[in-house]
Amino acid sequence: MAERISLRDYQRDLAARLKAADSGRTSSKLAVQAGAEGWLVDLMEAGEVIPVPPITAVAQTRPWFKGVSNVRGNLYSVIDFPAFLGGNGVALGEQSRLLLVAQRYRAGAALLVDGSLGLRNPDSWQPREPAQAPAAWLRAEYEDEAGRVWKELDVAELVRDANF
């Protein structure tokens, strides 16, 4: 049976959630798998996550640049994110996804990842110091309750990075 709450408690909770949403302080992040690493992306920085469409290879590019893909009439540069990070590239499969960078960055870029892991809220996780000197686009690093390390991506810094 559903738990009963008073109208006053319901209204107070609803008002708090609306206030948090209006102020942009919602903490849910999109979680993706990139190789062996878990990455978090702010929802305001992610355009959308889609199954991998056909990718047309481009010659004479870096190994992590997979090519270009047409998504609803828009061309996106497809970057194999785990390979960009220095690891093995994505083995394309049913779980593979393209994370489209938000339109406001005008980057026309999509990150190829091993899979989407849904939404996560890192508010209760322990912040940690990165094991090595972080890139400018590594916003933060966390450890969750299970001991898994999560890295938060700063998309604005990533698209400004000269290596990207």
What are these regions (language model features)?
Residues 1-164:
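An acidic, low-aromatic, low-complexity terminal/linker signal
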